[in-house]
Curated annotation (Swiss-Prot):
Topology in the lipid bilayer: Multi-pass membrane protein
InterPro entries: Ccc1_fam, CHP00267
Subcellular locations according to the entry: Cell membrane
Keywords, alphabetical: Cell membrane, Membrane, Transmembrane, Transmembrane helix
Protein known as: Uncharacterized protein MJ0645
Keyword NADP: no
Species of origin: Methanocaldococcus jannaschii (strain ATCC 43067 / DSM 2661 / JAL-1 / JCM 10045 / NBRC 100440) (Methanococcus jannaschii)
Amino acid sequence: MLRIPRSLKSIINTINGESGTRYIVRGLIDGSLSALGVVIGASGSADASVIIAAGLGGGIANGLSNILGAFTAEKASLERERIQKEKSLLKKNGYLKKSIIYKKAIRETMICGLIDGISTTIGSALPVVPFFLFDIKTALYVAIGITIAILFILGVFIGKISKENVIISGIKMVAGALAVAILCFMIEKAF
């Protein structure tokens, strides 16, 4: 029988857990919408390589930023909770850092940060793909379609998890994508 290393099990459990799912969804939304904004903003260029570089560069920067942001925010929250527990237990500062629970929480925090950043990077790469395959105008419309599809699927998923109407949840996400597209087209046309 195949044995899965304990650290890999921890990663899989985090991905399948509530935190992992939340960061995957958040990252995909963040990445796809920000990349859509970048490709629309850069679409005035006659050179697809400029749009591709801007989209991928922005996506990678956004992904790395989300790794750092998620890890920093989660760790700060974890530390605040640890300090409060130590005070209520009348223990000295740092006492709980040696606990298995604390070490597991730190590991999950790091995994969630990575999940967020990787999901953001993947989400941002998807709207850029059409610029490898089509002329700029066609690629732009395909990128918008891809982003709308991603967000509709995520909306349906969110609706299913939250026991809401999945179609309405999907439509709400599509409305967000359309709002981003319209605003970014307005900005692109202004310059």
